[in-house]
Structure formats: C-alpha cells, structure tokens
Amino acid sequence: MKNIEERIKKIIFEKLDIKQEKIFNDASFIDDLGADSLDTVELIMALEEEFDIEISDEEAEKINTVQKSIDFIQKKNLKK
C-alpha cells in the first residue's frame, strides 16, 4: 500500500492537474497550486473517500497545505 503522502499527492495531481514533481509538502492549495474554493472542497471530499474518514468543516478550513493534509490524515489514522 502506498504511504499517505503519495496517496495525497496523487489525489492533488488528479484533481488539480498538476505534475506530481511540482507538488511540494509546504505548497498551499490556493496560493501555490492554484486551487479555488470549489477545488479545495473537492480535495477534502476525495481525502474523505480515499482514507474512509469524515472531515468536519472546521477541520477542512485548517487543511490548506499539502503537509497539513498529510499531518491530519496521519492523526486520523492513528485514532482508528
């Protein structure tokens, strides 16, 4: 099974059509990767589906970079 970081970057690649080598952990979805608000909602939904978790609106607002999404998923997986 791929690790969390690879899986998240694959989702970003698929949703935002950005080359994977351009997706850095400190990249902001909006400022660096060009996502708009609809894109970020779709990213959150894709994360929920991929990792079989629920992300509240409050949590989703805090997930605004690649690294924050990795950290969040790692914490959620530890609680399972």
Swiss-Prot record:
Chief localisation class: cytoplasm
O-(pantetheine 4'-phosphoryl)serine carried by residues: 37
Keywords: Cytoplasm, Fatty acid biosynthesis, Fatty acid metabolism, Lipid biosynthesis, Lipid metabolism, Phosphopantetheine, Phosphoprotein
SUPFAM superfamilies for the chain: ACP-like
Pathway: Lipid metabolism; fatty acid biosynthesis
Domain of life assignment: Bacteria
A GO BP annotation: lipid A biosynthetic process
GO function terms (MF aspect): acyl binding; acyl carrier activity
Pfam families: PP-binding (PF00550)
Family classification: Belongs to the acyl carrier protein (ACP) family.
Annotated function: Carrier of the growing fatty acid chain in fatty acid biosynthesis.
PANTHER family reported in the protein's UniProt record: ACYL CARRIER PROTEIN (PTHR20863), CARRIER DOMAIN-CONTAINING PROTEIN (PTHR20863:SF76)
Name assigned to this protein: Acyl carrier protein
Source species: Buchnera aphidicola subsp. Acyrthosiphon pisum (strain APS)
Gene name of the record: acpP
